[in-house]
């Protein structure tokens, strides 16, 4: 049967990334308390394509996922990327997995337990070297210092979305990374709060006002103190309660120089 993908292309244009995007597929994530957690990821898989090939073999990406069915984990991402390079005769392979991860949290006063969802990301690239990035998105509460200072009856607050991506010299638990970030807002966010908990969380936020700038700086100091983290990017978006826009701040460390390669795109 004719293989059109392997036919020669005469336009002399190499393609940096080609593959499949947004495949929903079950994966296994290492859980600090329960050994492992099963979840469903949205997966992107790409390879490079030399200028002389007309196309890549799209079906092989899905075949590779099926080959690793039930065994797709953080530990074997490098193996999966190598298989992509081998099967698709590529010099570079890219893999990104976005998935929900659940952690049981306890309310501060009632001690009521509930599952809190966090959006997580694993991203890997394999060419001559391996590059792996772990990302998490953590919701926080932020109370406006200016509003508290000038108001006689309370202060307005925001729900913050803190996005952190890190490169590591050794393994870091998702739970630990999330815990560090949750210490950096006015107050944490919970899935379940009773009245006594709402009172405690509200008062905690009021006693700990923070601008968006304060949050990214606090997270930056936390991550700088972790020797296993070799690079990170922190973004915080505060969804304003009295404005029709958001407040935003970002820190990348080490900072990128003008002639350096840009940080990997999400």
UniProtKB/Swiss-Prot annotation:
Positions bearing the site annotation: May be catalytically important: 144
Catalytic activity, reaction form: GTP + H2O = 7,8-dihydroneopterin 3'-triphosphate + formate + H(+)
EC number: 3.5.4.16
GO biological process: tetrahydrofolate biosynthetic process
MF (Gene Ontology): GTP cyclohydrolase I activity
Record key words, sorted: Hydrolase
Pfam families in alphabetical order: GCHY-1 (PF02649)
Function field: Converts GTP to 7,8-dihydroneopterin triphosphate.
PANTHER family: GTP CYCLOHYDROLASE MPTA (PTHR36445:SF1)
Name of the protein this chain belongs to: GTP cyclohydrolase FolE2
Organism: Syntrophotalea carbinolica (strain DSM 2380 / NBRC 103641 / GraBd1) (Pelobacter carbinolicus)
